[in-house]
Amino acid sequence: MDLSNRRNPLRDLSFPPPPPPPIFHRASSTGTSFPILAVAVIGILATAFLLVSYYVFVIKCCLNWHRIDILGRFSLSRRRRNDQDPLMVYSPELRSRGLDESVIRAIPIFKFKKRYDQNDGVFTGEGEEEEEKRSQECSVCLSEFQDEEKLRIIPNCSHLFHIDCIDVWLQNNANCPLCRTRVSCDTSFPPDRVSAPSTSPENLVMLRGENEYVVIELGSSIGSDRDSPRHGRLLTGQERSNSGYLLNENTQNSISPSPKKLDRGGLPRKFRKLHKMTSMGDECIDIRRGKDEQFGSIQPIRRSISMDSSADRQLYLAVQEAIRKNREVLVVGDGGGCSSSSGNVSNSKVKRSFFSFGSSRRSRSSSKLPLYFEP
């Protein structure tokens, strides 16, 4: 056998050619990575949303449980109070300490007027500078009063406020916002007590207000309703202007306050200032006896005077002097004699005119003097 003719089996084996390099390898890797990134972002956002929702839900639940706990404690404490005092009744005064709507509407309203001062040449108010500023502004809203503006005046302390301001205040409070005086609208007078200001009769003639005031006549005439005791009537118009001369018409035992209140020029200083419908009126006490009247019909008068006013003290002494003289006349009448002056008069009267409400801000000038009548 020839060895050269033999074929090598290793040579006869043929190897396949190598595969060609991939052309789209980079494009396929980019396309597979994009969906993975999108899924990852969406998953992160969904997880964040779920976490936020969970935290919101937990916070709301905690707040609700806290409220429920507070309400439960409140109801439990309320039940305990009810068990301790089962007869306890709820009072609306505990909730609101203000005044009723009817009482608030009963507080008087008037128009604010400024008076021109010829000496100063400006519009001014009563009192000193601080008192003038306080009397011209509302202490609730701190705004100044305008001329012809409607205001409310507290009857007890005579302080002025805007209608809206004081109405809102009195709905929650029952006192004056300036002096803390309790507000009440009881304007009725007791049968044996008349509240009257201390002002001379001349001052009333100088005032030209449109307010009505009351004249109370106390007399002992029989069969006359007009002169019956404790009888009051309203005067307007001409009667109001003429009522300032009650002192001049009475010719006997007439008593008036001291003229020291009048300033130079015959006009009081406080009336040249701001005029606010103040509590001013004339005083005239006339004690007279008629021929046909019994001697026991004359009523003695006792009047309490505030000791901070010298003029009021003088008026009190003058009243006591008139009563003493009248008693002397009675003693002479019992003995058979009668003075000539006592026969010129007709009856026993006590006249007093005053405004329906007062508003002087100064305590000394606005002291109200009660008048007592003894049988």
UniProtKB/Swiss-Prot annotation:
Compositionally biased spans, kind Polar residues: 238-257
Catalytic activity: S-ubiquitinyl-[E2 ubiquitin-conjugating enzyme]-L-cysteine + [acceptor protein]-L-lysine = [E2 ubiquitin-conjugating enzyme]-L-cysteine + N(6)-ubiquitinyl-[acceptor protein]-L-lysine
Transmembrane segments: 39-59
Molecular function (Gene Ontology), one example: transferase activity
InterPro entries, sorted: ATL1/ATL16-like, Znf_RING, Znf_RING/FYVE/PHD
GO biological process, one term: protein ubiquitination
Pathway field: Protein modification; protein ubiquitination
The protein's enzyme class: transferase
Localization terms from the record: Membrane
Alphabetically ordered keywords of this record: Membrane, Metal-binding, Transferase, Transmembrane, Transmembrane helix, Ubl conjugation pathway, Zinc, Zinc-finger
Membrane topology: Single-pass membrane protein
Organism domain of life: Eukaryota
Chain positions of all zinc fingers (RING-type): 138-180
EC numbers: 2.3.2.27
Comment, domains: The RING-type zinc finger domain mediates binding to an E2 ubiquitin-conjugating enzyme.
Assigned protein family: Belongs to the RING-type zinc finger family. ATL subfamily.
Protein name: RING-H2 finger protein ATL16
Name of the encoding gene: ATL16
